[in-house]
Amino acid sequence: MKNKQFIILAVVCVVTLLPFMGLTDFHTKGEPREAIVAYSMIETGNWTLPVNNGGDIAYKPPLFHWCIAALSSIAGKVTEYTSRMPSALALIAMVLGGFLFYAKRRGASVALLMGLITLSNFEVHRAGMNCRVDMMLTAFIVLALYQLYRCCEKGVPWIATLFMGCATLTKGPVGILLPCMVTGVFLLIRGTSFFKAFFSMALVAITSCILPALWYIAAYQQGGDNFISLVM
């Protein structure tokens, strides 16, 4: 039953998202602003510190643009469809990840209902159909929270730190700060001492910085003080 409902949810996600992403042109200034960075990566070959259409350094970390550029390289060019694909895939991953999380704790029926409600939420669905970093950031944060909860039950949060590192590479330190703060409050509510909760989350946060630090170091080596000014 669980596998059947998982497949149903996956099919609904694919059918309601993937066929429609390229039907409209870019309709906000934010969409082409992200797509042009991926276009710049492909044209210049600079995937570390790309520039936007005006020649300025892109002010967001590059994971979202890497995904667009990779998909567009396969397709042959940057299009509305390839530019929106990372957001759609992030939404699908978030919904299916949520299904697996809730199916284990509340049953497959509740998990399926959760997935359908999430997918049909207007703002979530809109973000999953746009070429913006927000859906990918949200997906990584939500998946990190699922893993942190799982690690509160048992285990070490290695996967959570990977998700938070990817979230930071999508839109900056909020990808680490937000899930750590939420989990810290959760631990306090559960009766964990303040210092234990604080140092546990501090260790998780520091570990999560390793992956994005690799890009920040490479970007600084290439951009120097201009990159520091942009980040600060």
Predicted regions: what is each one?
Residues M1-M232:
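Membrane-integral, polyisoprenol-dependent glycosyltransferases
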